[in-house]
Amino acid sequence: MTPRRKSRMTVILFVLLGISIASALVLYALRQNIDLFYTPTEVVYGKNEDATQKPSVGQRIRVGGMVVAGTVERDPKSLKVKFDLNDIGPSISVEYEGILPDLFREGQGIVAQGVLKTPTLLEATEVLAKHDENYVPPELDAQMQKVHKPMGVADLKGESERDRQEKAYQKTSMQEGQK
């Protein structure tokens, strides 16, 4: 190998090594800042009920679900709030210190972002409330659709409750008209 080729090979090797190290550092930094989305059931049992895919204590995560009615506890001397969050299965507790969104209520859907302190306790740094009363986060909707059969026309034998009421009203008004 000539000295010129040797120096080119050395430069190329150092450039590739530098790119590899930079890529590894970027991926490491991104890995620590990624907040994965979980439902309360997935926090307790793991994704797809696989215990190996449970979030670990100390991990930053986002949890989406509904605020359980009757579980909101406010500290009168500070902005600390504790409440339970659930979807279709077990619930987890969420602790948050700060001003809650205006749309935060019991029975409302929220997304809490924070650090998992115990397997069923999330210390939230941010709480986001939904804006539409019919909104359900897509991940939570998919989980709920797996377990709950959606109410639809098929469940009502081809007619809704309103259709049944209208038919009954028409039937009674026709009977009164014949008298």
Swiss-Prot record:
The keyword Transit peptide does not apply. It is a single-pass type II membrane protein. Signal peptide: none annotated. Its main location: membrane. The keyword Lipoprotein does not apply. Residues 30-179 are periplasmic. Heme binds at H131, Y135. It is found in: Cell inner membrane. This is Cytochrome c-type biogenesis protein CcmE. It comes from Pasteurella multocida (strain Pm70).
